[in-house]
């Protein structure tokens, strides 16, 4: 079912969206927009990418220049697709206005309250559903990835920035304005580095690719073992806080930094989780790499489109037969 208006919620009920099973058939247009790159693709009913294009995200302050780059790859995949998509799903960095009407990604300077949904709908001539990119990943990992079959989990992206999405009782948490799960701004070092949000010591300021490059003076991909392990420790600290708070026992972590740092990152994260999850219900908490690899952002965006169809019920995502 689709998100319900706040007025339809019982007192104290958290607004959520059911993650499945999804019965909507057919292909969808999937769009992922990040601070470093943007990508568009056509995805079928089993989560397979039929065609895709990507481009670097412009660093311009001009919102139209950023959208022009997006327009080029979207029109490219629509022209190359053997089957016309039925609807469009978008994963974009946050924060964003409720329902994804406007987006203000912290790592895309040119977009502040940019009307992305309306502009894409006008471009594509189809319904467009926009959500946070990490929440999109959470849907994708539950559909065909490392969280498939799990009803309670945290999904994270550790890349240019850090984001997250939370699924509890088989339902994706939205929150008041649709930004639930924004784990990048959980404080992991109270007197830590300044963050773009205005705070200090946020996970994104300590463990994102941007923060690591700024602190070391070289690309995050060239970080030595101590930096890779510190990144994992910071992420493990944040995961432990979420596990202790929400009684979930699985964190799935994707993104170029986390996956690129590999065992150094995940071993350090596991050690930190073991150190900080002392309560009996939290001790089994696991952290594992995302199962979708480089396809994760587009599969997640496709899951956003399929969820937006409204044809969902129960817990757990299933494949279409086509």
Question: Which sequence ranges carry the predicted segments?
Answer:
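Glycine-rich beta-alpha junction loops
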Residues: 94, 160-162, 178, 201, ...
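ATP-binding/phosphotransfer module of carbohydrate and carboxylate kinases, centering on a glycine-rich
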Residues: 2-87, 97-100, 118-126, 140-150, ...
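General beta-strand structural signal in soluble alpha/beta enzymes
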Residues: 128-132
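Short beta-strand segments
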Residues: 32, 89-93, 155-161, 165-167
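A charged helix-plus-loop insertion that forms the helical arch/lid used to bind
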Residues: 101-112
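Glycine/small-residue-rich loop that forms an oxyanion/phosphate-binding "nest" at active or ligand-binding sites
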Residues: 135, 139
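Short, intrinsically disordered, charge-biased short linear motifs at domain edges
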Residues: 179-188
